[in-house]
């Protein structure tokens, strides 16, 4: 006989992997972050030509991270990966002011994609240990983040080589995923309960009303 959990949200933590897309321009540090999370060490990388995919566990969630190549000629191939995406990690080189407009343009395109509608957005501002990186307020303005109204977003500064900021950003994203799943689970249970009550009400026979005469 199986064991039944009394926690109504226990299904949230089942083993089914949650798909996250890790996107951004080439050289922004996506692959370095991926393998820092996967191996807890910094590995030498070259620009990704297609994609890397790894699954990690964080806050009881199985997260499958898809690190897609960021070269301009390859970005047009991102779209087939959008299906069933739960959240987006957009990686920006905070030391590269020459390409920040290009990064902002790519992010704006992503925000218009129907398949990514509602996906929480985590921005990793990498290379904060470089000389004169963009601070978070400047980066927020440059990326036009205040114009994003249809989803939750968060900017996390990182120093990947030291592992600073990566897990904090993933904490935020995991918390939002859990909150979303709890909300969907509650709405589903509430809808089912109301439907059951309605069906029960409809199945009851109509009882004829008795005429009651008032005594005067």
From Swiss-Prot:
Keywords: Golgi apparatus, GTP-binding, Nucleotide-binding, Protein transport, Transport
Any one Pfam family match given in the protein's UniProt record, by short name: Arf
CDD domains reported in the protein's UniProt record: Arf_Arl (cd00878)
Keyword check for Protein biosynthesis: no
Domain of life where this protein originates: Eukaryota
Bias kind Polar residues: ranges: 205-216
Biased composition (Low complexity): 188-204
Function in brief: GTP-binding protein involved in protein trafficking; may modulate vesicle budding and uncoating within the Golgi apparatus.
PANTHER family for this protein: ADP RIBOSYLATION FACTOR-RELATED
Official protein name in the record: ADP-ribosylation factor D
Upper classification of the organism: Eukaryota, Amoebozoa, Evosea, Eumycetozoa, Dictyostelia
